[in-house]
Regions:
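Fe(II)/2-oxoglutarate oxygenase catalytic core
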Residues: 2-252, 256-288
Length: 288
């Protein structure tokens, strides 16, 4: 197993292993490194969806995403983060399913709209592009750690309202039509703005701009200004690793201490096919 650093504050790559055939010692080592480095890139992994699911289940149960149009028809645990349908055709720009996925171009944390958000995500790049479509990952431990002490005191007991419907409101195309899937069936949830990781016990900012409606019990305009400040602070280059995809890269990240986004690409002409499994969270976020 060959381990290489990808960024001074976040991310490693691991080569020389086969994710479809891991012994327990290697898996336990990967799990330990994941908690330490937050993001792991596994290059050259020509795995099937079944292999992908099997690897994900070694970390725990897997989510089934509420969006019906993005689930694999064969394996519902596979979330198709793709601008291509299951017949291999590019999804038209105005289609609901693409407009929903386009919101991943915003910074976010997977499943922040759930009462118990996900522990992590594992993404397989099946057909990638070198013309955009890179994924950015931010270290939210470090972003919190570097805040001035006065700001830490200001935000440590604050809570944020997250709502899945907020994703819909960000797109005119989604807002004006009856949406597919179960978009409207999830109630808003409230999460701490600063959370403690259940395994590492470290504190981090918990931000997810595509679902964050407001700070709970806080002046709306002041709350939005504060959230915007924290977002901009967290996405400075010193906290962010940019992953430039190659076909058959597998990337996993810890949603409890990272935030991520996708760089835009020409979705009308380029096929970007990505499959994700998402690790079900095992407890509500802990206030730091």
């Amino acid at each position: 197993m060959i381990v290489k650093s990808l960024h001074e504050n976040i991310g490693i790559s691991i080569e020389g292993i086969d994710l479809s055939n891991l012994d327990n010692d290697t898996f336990q080592n990967i799990k330990k490194l994941w908690l330490e480095y937050l993001v792991i890139v596994f290059p050259h992994q020509n795995i099937s969806d079944e292999d992908h699911i099997k690897f994900g289940k070694r970390f725990g149960k897997l989510e089934v995403h509420p969006s019906l149009s993005h689930r694999s028809s064969k394996n519902p645990e596979i979330y198709r983060v793709s601008n291509v349908d299951e017949n291999g055709d590019i999804i038209p720009n105005k289609e609901t399913s693409w407009q929903y996925l386009k919101q991943s171009w915003l910074w976010h944390t997977d499943s922040s709209f759930r009462k118990i958000p996900s522990n992590g995500s594992i993404l397989h790049g099946i057909s990638t592009t070198n013309k955009g479509g890179n994924t950015l990952f931010a270290n939210m431990y470090k972003a919190y750690e570097d805040l001035e002490e006065s700001m830490k005191q200001k935000i440590k007991k604050l809570k944020v309202v997250h709502d899945h419907k907020f994703i819909i409101s960000l797109s005119d195309e989604l807002s004006k039509r009856k949406n597919k899937g179960n978009y409207d069936k999830l109630d808003p949830v409230i999460h701490p703005l600063v959370r403690k990781h259940p395994s590492t016990k470290k504190s981090s900012l918990f931000l997810s701009p595509h679902t964050m409606v407001k700070i709970h019990d806080y002046d709306d305009s002041e709350g939005r200004e504060l959230l915007d400040f924290l977002i901009e602070h967290s996405i400075q280059s010193k906290y962010v690793y940019k992953h430039i995809w190659n076909n058959n890269d597998v990337v996993m990240w810890d949603n409890r201490c990272t935030m991520h986004s996708v760089e835009p690409f020409d979705n009308k002409t380029i096929k970007r096919i990505m499959h994700r499994v998402t690790l079900i969270g095992d407890q509500k976020p802990i206030m730091a």
